[in-house]
Amino acid sequence: MKKFKCVVCGYIYTGEDAPEKCPVCGAGKDKFVEVKDEGEGWADEHKIGVAKGVDKEVLEGLRANFTGECTEVGMYLAMARQADREGYPEVAEAYKRIAFEEAEHASKFAELLGEVVVADTKTNLQMRVDAEKGACEGKKELATLAKKLNYDAIHDTVHEMCKDEARHGSAFRGLLNRYFK
């Protein structure tokens, strides 16, 4: 048995010959092409690092936008927390929603650049395990210094984030071990 695809609507027909008419869109037999077994090939898909080798000014703009979008995520979430403290939960939710949209923008810049993400999940997980370990250590050092200088609020907040980084790293390590070791 062969497979035939309607180039108009994408319908796949299995048989010895293409049908006289597409049952979905009504296109004639001449609009069917035989499909060779090529796996799951897609007509197009997102690719990591398409900006590699582009004009220097464009590259700098992409990097600046990535940094800006990441910064906005943090700012908007902080603003959401403040709005909640002042009793404006709807404002807080708007900030959170917009922060997520800014995070999506940042992720697209990251994909274009291909500098902080690669086209391999195992490698991405390992990079994050390593990065979260470093972030945990850096925050622990900062928290310790803040405590030494009697900046209790700074110590408490940064120390809690240090523990969050350890939790993140453990989660990534668990996924790495489950899927790739």
UniProtKB/Swiss-Prot annotation:
It comes from Clostridium acetobutylicum (strain ATCC 824 / DSM 792 / JCM 1419 / IAM 19013 / LMG 5710 / NBRC 13948 / NRRL B-527 / VKM B-1787 / 2291 / W). Homodimer. Residues 52-181 form the Ferritin-like diiron domain. Functions as the terminal component of an NADH peroxidase (NADH:H(2)O(2) oxidoreductase) when using NADH:rubredoxin oxidoreductase (NROR) and rubredoxin (Rd) as electron transport intermediaries from NADH to revRbr 1. Plays an important role in the oxidative stress defense system in C.acetobutylicum, an obligate anaerobic bacterium. Also exhibits NADH oxidase (NADH:O(2) oxidoreductase) activity in vitro, which is 100-fold lesser than that of FprA1/2 using the same electron transfer components. Its cofactor is Fe(3+). Fe cation 2 binds at residues 69, 102, 165. Its EC number is 1.11.1.1. GO terms for molecular function: electron transfer activity; iron ion binding; NADH peroxidase activity. Induction: Up-regulated by heat and oxidative stress (exposure to air, O(2) and H(2)O(2)) (at mRNA and protein levels). Various other environmental stress conditions such as an increase of the pH of the growth medium from 4.5 to 6.2, addition of the salt NaCl or of the solvent butanol, and lowering the incubation temperature also result in transiently increased transcript levels. Is also expressed under non-stressful conditions. Repressed by PerR. The keyword Iron applies. It comes from the Bacteria. The keyword NADP does not apply. Binds 3 Fe(3+) ions per subunit. Fe cation 1 binds at residues 6, 9, 22, 25. Residues 1-35 form the Rubredoxin-like domain. One of its GO terms (biological process) is hydrogen peroxide catabolic process. Gene3D superfamilies: 1.20.1260.10, 2.20.28.10. Pfam families: Rubrerythrin (PF02915), RUBY_RBDX (PF21349). Keywords: Detoxification, Electron transport, Iron, Metal-binding, NAD, Oxidoreductase, Peroxidase, Stress response, Transport. It catalyses: H2O2 + NADH + H(+) = NAD(+) + 2 H2O. Fe cation 3 binds at residues 102, 132, 165, 168. This is Reverse rubrerythrin-1.
